[in-house]
Amino acid sequence: MATITAKMVGDLRAKTDAPMMECKKALTEADGNMEKAEELLRVKLGNKASKAASRVTAEGVVASAVSGSTGALIEVNCETDFVSKNDSFLAFVQACVNLVVEHNPADVAALSALPLAMEDFGPTVEDVRKGLIGKIGENLAIRRFKRYGDGGSLAHYLHGVRIGVMVEYSGDAVAAKDVAMHIAAMKPVSLTSADVSADLIEKERAVAAGKAAEDAKAAEAAGKPAQSAEIVAKRIEGSIQKFLKEVSLFNQTFVKNDKQTVEQMLKAAGTTVKGFTMYVVGEGIEKKQDDFAAEVAAQVAAAKGQ
């Protein structure tokens, strides 16, 4: 039986990022053979990947890439903010967005099937993802991407790694970059009021109607006369129009000059925005709220066989 030294364990940990005890066990099982120990860990790490797959990934990063008139924006999620700063994870995300630009995959499944080799993992994006899950110890998920490649000019802006914007435009590059930064700050949902989805408008209408009903109850309780149905309808419609102005890009007040709308700024710069995409990390994902005390109590109970 080979002697397992601290240096051997340290070297294996440096290569795999596996826990120290797992590295020592693998080296012992492999009788000191580093290559065999690494393979044994890969099997264990692969099992770890399947266990992690059900865990919520509400953290992560947004990344972008542009090559000529082709560009892409991608969101890849992990479980914790700590892992979102991991160099291996960040390199994987950038490799993925570069592949989107180069190969134009139809969806996440198609992207996952593309060739990729990283850190001895591969030969596909999916294989690398699973390998990194085992290495890092968290679930990782490619959530979404958007590719632009119709020949227009592209401006992109990343606010840290949590907000990313891609703008398709013709005209002035500086104005387009300013618009990308504006979008990250003000978060419009469409170019114009006419582009806002009917579902979103109906949700806002329901909110406005609910507010009107609450006001009517308060007026009644105070002994004040109720507003006519016509006035209530006008109030609701006014709320809708205000909402549409607030969420449509061209109608928003330009963040760098409150004397102009975005539309006015673009016109003065001779620039046309054809479309945009904005990703915010974890947007719409319900993040699990852990009750630490309850979790510890459950573990203690399990240990006692209760």
From Swiss-Prot:
Keywords: Cytoplasm, Elongation factor, Protein biosynthesis. It is found in: Cytoplasm. It comes from the Bacteria. CDD domains: UBA_EF-Ts. Its main location: cytoplasm. GO terms for cellular component: cytoplasm. PROSITE patterns: EF_TS_2. SUPFAM superfamilies: Elongation factor Ts (EF-Ts), dimerisation domain, UBA-like. Residues 80-83 are annotated as: Involved in Mg(2+) ion dislocation from EF-Tu. GO terms for molecular function: translation elongation factor activity. InterPro entries: EF-Ts_dimer_sf, Transl_elong_EFTs/EF1B, Transl_elong_EFTs/EF1B_dimer, Transl_elong_Ts_CS, UBA-like_sf. Belongs to the EF-Ts family. Associates with the EF-Tu.GDP complex and induces the exchange of GDP to GTP. It remains bound to the aminoacyl-tRNA.EF-Tu.GTP complex up to the GTP hydrolysis stage on the ribosome. This is Elongation factor Ts. It comes from Leptothrix cholodnii (strain ATCC 51168 / LMG 8142 / SP-6) (Leptothrix discophora (strain SP-6)). The gene is tsf.
